[in-house]
Amino acid sequence: MELIRFSISIPSKLLEKFDQIIEEIGYENRSEAIRDLIRDFIIRHEWEVGNEEVAGTITIVYNHDEGDVVKALLDLQHEYLDEIISSLHVHMDEHNCLEVIVVKGEAKKIKMIADKLLSLKGVKHGKLVMTSTGKELV
């Protein structure tokens, strides 16, 4: 992979804060941190456009005693077999469950599936976390 050197102008206090944070995180150098930021910027743009294939997780916490939430969750997961790769179910206590659903597919469709799951009655909290499949990243 060919590397290109370029320069940027940045306020000194912003750079000082950036250097402090990347040192705390453990980056070996500024260049690797900048590369990660650029990759993240590209991935977020792909989500907004919605055409690119993404991977991610939909994490939800729900009360399994409330209504038909368990049946609705299972029905939705079976409806999207091509996009839902796997799921992990954890009993948090006697009433609450945590479900982590691994997904892969077109960004728009993954967002739509997450919206459907997160809006189910009985779901207390949830979050979609998307990332790249890695195919297009350098």
Swiss-Prot record:
**Which GO terms are recorded in the biological process aspect for this UniProt protein?**
response to nickel cation
Tell me which UniProt keywords the record has, alphabetically.
DNA-binding, Metal-binding, Nickel, Transcription, Transcription regulation
How is the cofactor bound, in the record's words? Binds 1 nickel ion per subunit.
The entry marks the following residues as binding Ni(2+), namely H78, H89, H91, C97
Cofactor entry? Ni(2+)
Query: One GO MF term, please?
Result: DNA-binding transcription factor activity
Under Gene3D superfamilies, the record lists: ACT-like. Chain A, domain 2 (3.30.70.1150), Met repressor-like (1.10.1220.10)
Looking up Pfam families in the UniProt record yields: NikR_C, RHH_1
Entry keyword Metal-binding = yes
* PANTHER family, alphabetized: NICKEL-RESPONSIVE REGULATOR
Annotated function: Transcriptional regulator.
Similarity section: Belongs to the transcriptional regulatory CopG/NikR family.
Q: What's the protein name?
A: Putative nickel-responsive regulator
Q: Which organism is it from?
A: Pyrococcus horikoshii (strain ATCC 700860 / DSM 12428 / JCM 9974 / NBRC 100139 / OT-3)
Phylogenetic classification of the source organism:
Archaea, Methanobacteriati, Methanobacteriota, Thermococci, Thermococcales
